[in-house]
């Protein structure tokens, strides 16, 4: 009898704690009002990769050699398509160009990477001015990534991102050093 009462009290205590300490909600961005011919203007242009979070360090390992990454997001050549170009500055100073195409899903900003059917990307708003968050999932990994219009956003932005992702049980955290100058983006 005592064990049943104790279990019930612990259960109620858990419910109470869960209701008090819930993770803050971040709304997923949508294409609301867009006629399918272009992506919402505020999200096009240049972005800097600031930080990442994942359940394990292995899911962030691809970013270990990175000092900084600068991206350019542009409307694609066909409706519901985005073209991304990036230049990665490695910690040893090399510049590595990359480009890929995202396909938008109708009515929201779920992105599918062309040539990688297992990869899914969702865009989320950020409380940080000039910021955006992405959640990438694929075969064997999931991670949140923080981007900003500035290569050096306020420290509070990074702290809020880390707090949010930690609350979601993403315990591994990576902050890009951004010690070197960003590489120039190629125009093609």
Swiss-Prot record:
It comes from the Eukaryota. The keyword Transferase does not apply. Disulfide bonds join 23-167, 95-183, 128-157. Its main location: secreted. One of its GO terms (biological process) is reverse cholesterol transport. Pfam families: ApoM. One of its GO terms (molecular function) is antioxidant activity. Residues 1-22 form the signal peptide. It is found in: Secreted. Tetradecanoate binds at residues 136, 143. SUPFAM superfamilies: Lipocalins. Gene3D superfamilies: 2.40.128.20. Coiled coil: none annotated. Keywords: Disulfide bond, HDL, Lipid transport, Secreted, Signal, Transport. One of its GO terms (cellular component) is spherical high-density lipoprotein particle. Interacts with LRP2; LRP2 mediates APOM renal uptake and subsequent lysosomal degradation. Belongs to the calycin superfamily. Lipocalin family. Highly divergent. Probably involved in lipid transport. Can bind sphingosine-1-phosphate, myristic acid, palmitic acid and stearic acid, retinol, all-trans-retinoic acid and 9-cis-retinoic acid. This is Apolipoprotein M. It comes from Sus scrofa (Pig). The gene is APOM.
